[in-house]
Amino acid sequence: MAKKVVKTVKLQIPAGKANPAPPVGPALGQAQVNIPSFCSQFNETTKDQMGFVIPVIISVYEDRTFTFVTKTPPASDLLKKAAKIESGSANASQTKVATITHKQVEEIANLKLPDLNAYCVEKACKIIEGTARNMGILVKD
């Protein structure tokens, strides 16, 4: 018989840097999960993605065990890295802060494809271009 999921926790944690401090500790402490065990497993799983914030979905079962699934980094983080900027524009419609190529958008779309609501790379590129536009990043051909 399958274990019953008691709680699902969604967090965004820097890759390889999970520790019992907030936000990880309080979120998992409420679910009575072994926090050091989660931190070590998460850090081991994400050590090759250092520098990115990784979304994670943690399923907590009634016997206090857990499983977690990591997702790809947020599109905004990938776009900021590609454009070599710290943050997007405060007024994206009038102020453009950077320019990236369509090839860079395609690389990001290929990376994000499993987590996007799209079945082909062309549609995924449109989603990423929309995110870039909202951040004040110009996409050139």
Swiss-Prot record:
Forms part of the ribosomal stalk which helps the ribosome interact with GTP-bound translation factors. HAMAP family: Ribosomal_uL11. SMART domains: RL11 (SM00649). This is Large ribosomal subunit protein uL11. Pfam families: Ribosomal_L11, Ribosomal_L11_N. PROSITE patterns: RIBOSOMAL_L11. One or more lysine residues are methylated. Keywords: Methylation, Ribonucleoprotein, Ribosomal protein, RNA-binding, rRNA-binding. SUPFAM superfamilies: Ribosomal L11/L12e N-terminal domain, Ribosomal protein L11, C-terminal domain. It comes from Onion yellows phytoplasma (strain OY-M). GO terms for biological process: translation. Belongs to the universal ribosomal protein uL11 family. Part of the ribosomal stalk of the 50S ribosomal subunit. Interacts with L10 and the large rRNA to form the base of the stalk. L10 forms an elongated spine to which L12 dimers bind in a sequential fashion forming a multimeric L10(L12)X complex. GO terms for cellular component: cytosolic large ribosomal subunit. InterPro entries: Ribosomal_uL11, Ribosomal_uL11_bac-typ, Ribosomal_uL11_C, Ribosomal_uL11_C_sf, Ribosomal_uL11_CS, Ribosomal_uL11_N, Ribosomal_uL11_N_sf. One of its GO terms (molecular function) is structural constituent of ribosome.
